């Protein structure tokens, strides 16, 4: 414990602290009712004041009170008196030496300042906290000058008592609307501020009774201190539970530890990875037993810089690393090589690997005139036979970056994937809390969703997340919009568990059309026996098992690309570099502070690439003229542009050239041919993905027209089923076509079946 003497502290540091505060105030560096005392910045001004940092960590409460007093003095000296000064609070920013993991916060940290990082596991609604209770004596009277006198002694006395609420649980229970003088004294003594207030003359005589104060003793029962709602100070407070991120766990196999945080002066924060600076507090856990729960009291919390931004700063500070990455980017077929290395556990499926690799790089930041961001993420769906390795791919990508997240629909709920508002017991009583799901946790990353088709109820939750990249929750007085700007990498098996070669791919995808159409790329991965590929896969699996059994596995896990050793770390650096900072203009130092990805130079479409994409789009659209099915829509055009941008960034180029457009078109074209091909017409039909192919719609229209024709000629307004079949087969429809059409038209509400063998129009 650092020794502390307030007088000595003030003698050494008061003038320095006041000088620093005045400079900050002159630059208008105050946020609402919070003044952020930036310790790092203070020490840059006064390098010989390192002890201030140590004292803030060891005795945050006492130092906070002193700095608040100094702040008020500095403010008055600069701007004069201001009633709003009473509402000001001090928040410590950038302390050094108190960084901890959540799992490291223990009993020895009680009453000390700590700094830690974590994910918001759940967050309650914002409530009002009585921060400073102001009481006035009911026996004070006004004098002729507008001041106050004691009713019994007629001596000046404003009868005011201020009680700061520091420990919500031990002090809050004594705060009532009305207190007796004895209760006031007991509270102030328990808070250990009695002597200081007596010394300053801020205790009314009826509270600080002397032996000769008979007049007060006689009337003590009549004297009450009434809580003044107008002069008392209330602040926002939010209770949240923050969990240690897996990437910061000493042992990722153990359950992640979490801690309760009470955040003051907050408008409300419900999701994200956050940095917290606060004081470790305790509250009674078992009545009459000295066992306590630990919680954090904080008024400083900040959304953490994403892993992406942190790594960008590391890259920008390392010229040698930048040179290596740029050299890698110039290598021939570098995208194919890194794509295979990214998912090296699986043999083959090069196009799928490339698409997933590009997905991690993301497209360019672009905004509409009203400021609405355009989606830069690519959504990918893998539909695979068993044994292909879809779960392996998803888990590999989920482990790639901290903001990537994995979930399997077999064990997840819709709310667990998006977000839920639920009623739970909290430290301050039962209340509604927001629990962010996988899509929110994967903000700025990739949400890897396995076994997508296991639970159909989950799919309706996923649709909004993919469509708007936000999650809306509105329940229990909580109405928030949570960010879910993530790419989606989903996987499932075909409807019957394995692909049926007698059916088209789209007929075997058990996903609602609105959700299916949100995927930019849909890859059917079939397990087709082939001697050559089977031999390669067997060799690959055997070699992998041999390598992982050796002591030099980590060395063997790296690959050599023309003299450059690429391991997992360098692969991540390359993706981050391509994603964010390959195109930073002249002064890189500008981005070492508050790094903003949206201000980076992003690749632009060259005329050649633009013409190539436009030509492909128009040629495909032309195939859909007349009664032909539509092979492509504007949604696929946007997907092509995104993928072309990703490919250009993967080459570390600031231009989307014809090679990028060619790759993007080939990937989209390959997916369309596998998924949207209609064997009946021999054409690509996007309506197959949307739900009903044109060929099927034409058959249903034909059956409906037949029913209309028959009904118009009959008095009972009903069409016999036999006659419907007879006329339908006459124009080339099969019995199955008619059965399917009747079933669909009935579900759609176009026809009804009043009695067996007859159909009528609705």
From Swiss-Prot:
It comes from the Archaea. The keyword tRNA-binding does not apply. Disulfide bonds: none annotated. GO terms for biological process: DNA replication. ATP binds at residues 384-391. One of its GO terms (molecular function) is ATP binding. CDD domains: MCM. Pfam families: MCM, MCM_lid. Residues 334-542 form the MCM domain. InterPro entries: MCM, MCM_CS, MCM_dom, MCM_lid, NA-bd_OB-fold, P-loop_NTPase, WH-like_DNA-bd_sf. The keyword Nucleus does not apply. Belongs to the MCM family. PANTHER family: DNA REPLICATION LICENSING FACTOR MCM FAMILY MEMBER, DNA REPLICATION LICENSING FACTOR MCM4. This is Uncharacterized MCM-type protein MJ0961.
